[in-house]
From Swiss-Prot:
<keyword id="KW-0336">GPI-anchor</keyword>
<dbReference type="InterPro" id="IPR043957">
    <property type="entry name" value="Vanin_C"/>
</dbReference>
<keyword id="KW-0732">Signal</keyword>
<dbReference type="InterPro" id="IPR003010">
    <property type="entry name" value="C-N_Hydrolase"/>
</dbReference>
<feature type="glycosylation site" description="N-linked (GlcNAc...) asparagine">
    <location>
        <position position="87"/>
    </location>
</feature>
<dbReference type="GO" id="GO:0015939">
    <property type="term" value="P:pantothenate metabolic process"/>
</dbReference>
<dbReference type="InterPro" id="IPR040154">
    <property type="entry name" value="Biotinidase/VNN"/>
</dbReference>
<feature type="glycosylation site" description="N-linked (GlcNAc...) asparagine">
    <location>
        <position position="316"/>
    </location>
</feature>
<keyword id="KW-0378">Hydrolase</keyword>
<dbReference type="Pfam" id="PF19018">
    <property type="entry name" value="Vanin_C"/>
</dbReference>
<protein>
    <recommendedName>
        <fullName>Pantetheinase</fullName>
        <ecNumber>3.5.1.92</ecNumber>
    </recommendedName>
</protein>
<feature type="propeptide" description="Removed in mature form">
    <location>
        <begin position="493"/>
        <end position="514"/>
    </location>
</feature>
<feature type="active site" description="Proton donor">
    <location>
        <position position="179"/>
    </location>
</feature>
<feature type="signal peptide">
    <location>
        <begin position="1"/>
        <end position="22"/>
    </location>
</feature>
<comment type="similarity">
    <text>Belongs to the carbon-nitrogen hydrolase superfamily. BTD/VNN family.</text>
</comment>
<feature type="glycosylation site" description="N-linked (GlcNAc...) asparagine">
    <location>
        <position position="147"/>
    </location>
</feature>
<keyword id="KW-0472">Membrane</keyword>
């Protein structure tokens, strides 16, 4: 009897400990950082000069981290390139790099800074996490020596990686991620030999890590959610906004909803390069977001999130659209270009209506009602089903309702930032050939519409009430990863030409060297 009671007592005690040591909610912080850039140079600076630049940025990050901790935050995410900027060649970034060990070494740099050589940046980040009892996510550069025994070893005898690091609330290094999908112009870094799947567990859920351009590809982004069941993504980024479908807050919030996870996106603040847009996004709606092209200051965001995301019901993205007939119309289809992709469009000529437009295997259906039909603004329903080939190769299926740049239909698909037309109702669906579809709603002045729309299990994106502001776009952004035929960047700098970049008309997202 005593033994039986003791076992029951122990079992109850264990359950209590588990309950006490986990949290149902947590407070997340992201910091949009106005990075201090070093002077452009064709020759490497000294380690001391590089550290001086990095410490200027770390001073600003310290203020944000301390403020977040004082407001109760459990974790803070800071941007890609936030400690030294992006204007580098392979040689000139070298003084800014540190050797970042595998987290399995069980290391608190704040307590033992010389264990892995000279690591002042890791030491300072570790101390900021430890002194403020907060998880800190940051982006720095890693260097790894290699030799002739490695057939892929670069000629300069080292690999250089765009790297995210995570320090826990004790200052311990708990995660290291080498960015896999480098964006054009990141010639200063190597591509890891295979995608790294990086997670870390906390008392407020399981987290996954990836960086900027990674979000457009299956590995590691989708794998982290589908196979490793993370609750929250931490996402350092240097994202350049591209309308109509790839502004930062628009696409990142859509990815959170489409994948059913929390998403903590920290962007650089550099309006002259269209870099702004950070947010804390839950699966059902944005919790906090920031988009500011007018000022030069950074911004700290905080919000409470559920620790363990309950993945929403599975959406059959083609169920509704494939079960209805195409809406008849007398309007003439026309083509227009959105970020180099040729869409098939139909103009919305009435204040209310139903339209269908198709391209290849994708048919998009729209029902809508405007508050009024203005003569100075034109809206169109568009479809794109094809391989995007500019600044990356990725297969897209997109259904979009968008405002055209002018009152002439030939401008449909161009970037638009303001609108005057409000919509009382919309319902958008498509015959998608993928389960990976990301729902976007973007209002005038590049603002989100939290709580004003939702997705049904049969694949409709629809409004729940009249929108609170004039509409820029309503979009279902689909990805068919297996059709990508992605051209991987070489991990061997012998195939790279330092300082030479592919030039295109419009720079898109992530970490450019100019």
């Amino acid at each position: 009897m005593i033994t039986s009671r003791l076992l029951v007592y122990v079992a109850v005690l264990v359950l209590c400990v588990i309950k006490v040591s986990s949290r149902d909610t947590f407070i997340a912080a992201v910091y949009e950082h106005a990075v201090k850039l070093p002077n452009a140079t064709l020759v490497p600076v000294s380690h001391e000069e590089a550290l001086a630049v990095m410490n200027q940025n770390l001073d600003l990050l310290e203020a944000a981290i301390t403020s977040a901790a004082n407001q109760g935050a459990h974790i803070i995410v800071t941007p890609e390139d936030g400690i030294y900027g992006w204007n580098f060649s392979r040689e000139t970034i070298y003084p800014y790099l540190e050797d970042i060990p595998d987290p399995g070494v069980n290391w608190i740099p704040c307590n033992n800074p010389k264990r892995f050589g000279y690591t002042p940046v890791q030491e300072r980040l570790s101390c900021l996490a430890k002194d403020n009892s907060i998880y800190v996510v940051a982006n720095i550069g890693d260097k790894k020596p290699c030799n002739a025994s490695d057939s892929q070893c670069p000629l300069d005898g080292r690999y250089q990686y765009n790297t995210d690091v995570v320090f826990d609330s004790q200052g311990k290094l708990v995660a290291r991620y080498h960015k896999h999908n480098l964006f054009m112009g990141e010639n200063q870094f190597n591509v890891p030999k295979k995608p790294e799947i990086v997670t870390f567990d906390t008392i407020f859920g399981r987290f996954g890590v990836f960086t900027c351009f990674d979000i457009l590809f299956y590995d590691p982004a989708v794998t982290l959610v589908k196979d490793f069941h993370v609750d929250t993504i931490v996402f350092p980024t240097a994202w350049m906004n591209v309308l109509p479908h790839l502004s930062a807050i628009q696409f990142h919030s859509a990815w959170a909803m489409g994948m059913g996870v929390n998403f903590l996106a920290s962007n650089i603040h550099h309006p002259s390069k269209r870099m702004t847009g950070s947010g804390i996004y839950a699966p059902d709606s944005p919790r906090a977001f920031h988009y500011d092209m007018k000022t030069k200051e950074g911004k700290l965001l905080l919000s409470q999130l559920d620790s363990y995301t309950h993945h929403p019901i599975v959406v059959n993205w083609t169920s509704y659209a494939s079960g209805i007939k195409a809406f008849p119309t007398e309007n003439q289809e026309f083509t227009g270009t959105a970020f180099f992709d040729e869409f098939t469009f139909l103009e919305l000529t009435r204040v209310t209506g139903n339209y269908t437009v198709c391209q290849k295997k994708l048919c998009c259906h729209l029902s809508y009602k405007m508050s009024e039909k203005r003569t100075d603004e034109v809206y169109a329903l568009g479809a794109f089903d094809g391989l995007h080939v500019v600044e990356g190769r990725y297969y897209l299926q997109i259904c979009t309702l968008l405002k055209c740049k002018t009152a002439h239909v030939h401008t449909c698909g161009g970037a638009v930032e303001t609108a005057s037309t409000r919509f009382d109702m919309f319902s958008l669906s498509g015959t998608f050939g993928t389960q990976y579809v990301f729902p976007e709603v973007l209002l005038s002045e590049t603002q989100l519409a939290p709580g004003e729309f939702q997705v049904s299990s049969d694949g409709r994106l629809f409004s729940m009430k009249p929108l609170s502001g004039p509409l820029l776009t309503v979009t279902l952004f689909g990805r068919i990863y297996e059709k990508d035929q992605t051209l991987k960047a070489s991990s061997d700098p012998r195939s790279q030409v330092p300082g030479v970049m592919l030039l295109v008309i419009i720079p898109i997202v992530c970490s450019l060297s100019w």
